[in-house]
C-alpha cells in the first residue's frame, strides 16, 4: 500500500515545475480586453512561470488609487468599468512583481501602460474580446508567447 501511495506521490511531483527561488516568474504576459469598450484596453500585466502557471498574491500589498497624470493615462488605456479592477490587478499580479523586482504600485501601472502603447500594432492578432497580445522577458523586451 505504501509503495502505491509513494508511486502516486512521485507521479504528482514529477508534474510540478520547480522555480528558482530568486525568480518566482520568468516572463510577462500583457492581456487586453474589450470589456466595457469598443476598443482594446489593458486587462493586466501578468508575471508567468510558464504558459500555464503564474504566481499570484505573492505579498500583502496596499492599494492607493492613482492620481494625476497616471490616473488620466489609466482611464485612457486601462478603462475599468468595475472600480476594483486596478486594485485586483495590483494585489494579484503586481504584488509578485514587487516581491521579485521591488517595484511600487505606480511603476507597475506605468510599466503596463508603456508596454501596452508599444504593443498596439499587435492588437489585430486578437481573435476574441480578450487575449494575450504580447509577452515580454524580465527586461521588458518583446518575446514570442509560448
Give the residues covered by each predicted segment.
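Cleavable N-terminal signal peptides of Sec/SRP-targeted secreted and luminal proteins
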Residues: 3-21
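Betabetaalpha-Me/HNH-type nuclease active-site subdomain
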Residues: 17-80
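C-terminal, well-folded lobe of enzymatic/effector domains
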Residues: 68-146
Amino acid at each position: 500500500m505504501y509503495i502505491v501511495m509513494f508511486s502516486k506521490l512521485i507521479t504528482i511531483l514529477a508534474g510540478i515545475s520547480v522555480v528558482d527561488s530568486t525568480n518566482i516568474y520568468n516572463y510577462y504576459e500583457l492581456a487586453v480586453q474589450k470589456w466595457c469598450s469598443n476598443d482594446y484596453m489593458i486587462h493586466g500585466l501578468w508575471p508567468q512561470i510558464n504558459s500555464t502557471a503564474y504566481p499570484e498574491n505573492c505579498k500583502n500589498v496596499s492599494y492607493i488609487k492613482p492620481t494625476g497624470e497616471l490616473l488620466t493615462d489609466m482611464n485612457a488605456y486601462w478603462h475599468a468599468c468595475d472600480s476594483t479592477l486596478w486594485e485586483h490587478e495590483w494585489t494579484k499580479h503586481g504584488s509578485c512583481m514587487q516581491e521579485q523586482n521591488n517595484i511600487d504600485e505606480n511603476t507597475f501601472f506605468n510599466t503596463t501602460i508603456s508596454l501596452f502603447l508599444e504593443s498596439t500594432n499587435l492588437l489585430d492578432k486578437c481573435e476574441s474580446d480578450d487575449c494575450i497580445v504580447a509577452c515580454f522577458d524580465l527586461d521588458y523586451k518583446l518575446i514570442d508567447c509560448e
